[in-house]
Amino acid sequence: ELMNGRIHVESKPGKGTKFTVEIPLELASEGDICKKELPEQTFMTDKNIGKRILLAEDNDLNAEIAEFILEDMGLIVDRVEDGVQCVARMEQKPAGTYDLILMDIQMPNMDGYKATQAIRRLEDKKKAGIPIIAMTANAFEEDRKKAFEKGMNGHIAKPVDAEKVKKTILSALR
């Protein structure tokens, strides 16, 4: 009644009951139709599943968030807590062990910029050429530029947006 409609019931013993609900509605115009945006791509693909990411992050909470996002993409995550450990891990492991490094900038012992420069100087060119993405609280345009100048391939500002992390990682893994 509130919608100026009616309900009609028609019943035939032994055959069943038919309910009819009538509600007067206006047809939506083309401009009124809300088009739902579908994601451009799925983040978990056979191509990405099992790829290994080296996460250099000293903050446990930030590491936990990053690990959750990356593992949700089907990626395998190894974590180190500073730049010294990151460079050492890259030196110790065979080339191709990792597909990408997600690097914090402000870490103890060696910051992300110095770690990136040390990795870029490794003798093994495959190791030296690994994609490195900055994941940092340094969110200004000058910080983004500095990350690229120091040899990084991408920049993600904290607090992280999961969709941006996924898109940046996928782009770097191509």
Residue positions per predicted region:
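C-terminal compact regulatory domains
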Residues: 1-174
